[in-house]
């Protein structure tokens, strides 16, 4: 569900255009919520303190537990015994000496930071926010860190909120995800944080380039935590001052 706040005409206009765009694709699955009362009809669990002016909900979309999905897929692979998992950090790609008809050198494998070499007939990179280190994506994509925080909730709060839609305020990119295991997750996808690093240009004979790369284990800066508190005061006021049990910066590569 995408919502806009009172008095924010820019956010309202964006959400309205988004509604009409999605409506063309999803038809009756998309429902306009032109007033705060309409929003409350969809998420009464948020309470009367919910400070929104309107929005829309797409009943054809939803939230998926990515971690649970990966665990399930890994379990199936382990049961079949057809896939070998090797863990390590990739330092660079291995490139064929000769070029193809398209003047591009074929990737034949990877070199890990410990010097181990892995080769394959077909190399598929699913490297997410680390891709910019291995492939020159300058002017095409950039890795940014986005804020994520968790707070502990009671059993009663878990039952009350566990089936709510994901609520997104597109004016600031902050969204609240249905809680699982007594943890409420709030996150933001906006311009994000950058972590500039100098790395060798792939195939560049030692010449370096500056790209933004992930930094593991970094908590959300104070700016991000304060933004979450402000958003919670509008969406879930009773949670606004509750302690975050953990925060982290989650990295993405976007065009």
Regions picked out by a protein language model, each given a short descriptive name:
Residues 17, 38, 72, 89-92, ...:
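Alpha-helical elements of Rossmann-like donor-binding domains used by nucleotide-donor carbohydrate transfer enzymes
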Residues 34, 86-89, 246:
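Short loop/edge segments at beta-strand edges and connector loops
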Residues 4, 92-94, 176-177:
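A structural signal for short hydrophobic beta-strand segments in well-ordered beta-sheet cores
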Residues 118-125, 129-255:
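Active-site substrate-recognition segment that forms the wall
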Residues 6-14, 56-75, 217-226:
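Short beta-strand to alpha-helix junction loop
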Residues 3, 109, 148-150:
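Conserved hydrophobic/aromatic beta-strand scaffold that supports enzyme active sites
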Residues 1-42:
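Dinucleotide-binding Rossmann-like beta1-alpha1 core, especially the glycine-rich loop
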Residues 55-122, 126:
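Helical element adjacent to the flavin cofactor pocket in flavoenzyme catalytic cores
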